[in-house]
From Swiss-Prot:
The gene is IGKV3D-15. The keyword Magnesium does not apply. Keywords: Adaptive immunity, Cell membrane, Disulfide bond, Immunity, Immunoglobulin, Immunoglobulin domain, Membrane, Secreted, Signal. Residues 55-69 are annotated as: Framework-2. It comes from the Eukaryota. It is found in: Secreted; Cell membrane. Residues 1-20 form the signal peptide. It comes from Homo sapiens (Human). InterPro entries: Ig-like_dom, Ig-like_dom_sf, Ig-like_fold, Ig_sub, Ig_V-set, IgV_Light_Chain. GO terms for cellular component: extracellular region; immunoglobulin complex; plasma membrane. Residues 70-76 are annotated as: Complementarity-determining-2. Residues 21-43 are annotated as: Framework-1. This is Immunoglobulin kappa variable 3D-15.
Amino acid sequence: MEAPAQLLFLLLLWLPDTTGEIVMTQSPATLSVSPGERATLSCRASQSVSSNLAWYQQKPGQAPRLLIYGASIRATGIPARFSGSGSGTEFTLTISILQSEDFAVYYCQQYNNWP
């Protein structure tokens, strides 16, 4: 059995808008999981963003990669093990069967309100 690895998860990402800050809070900050396990990451908005929520994956030295948009729609080429759910203020990214290449930093971003 492979030793658990750290799946890094950004704790806080915020994007200001003209009506007030929307604060996106992600949890957990880090997640210790092993390949083959299920990983669940959560994102909470300080006010409703409807389904205007995206998830990104970033590996060292690489640009962020879009995984999910519209809260639950997989971007082109994203494996089916990645799924998104939620609306309003509560969102979840699930990796059903974690693979070694999935160990990365994950971000959520709202795009309901832009500056």
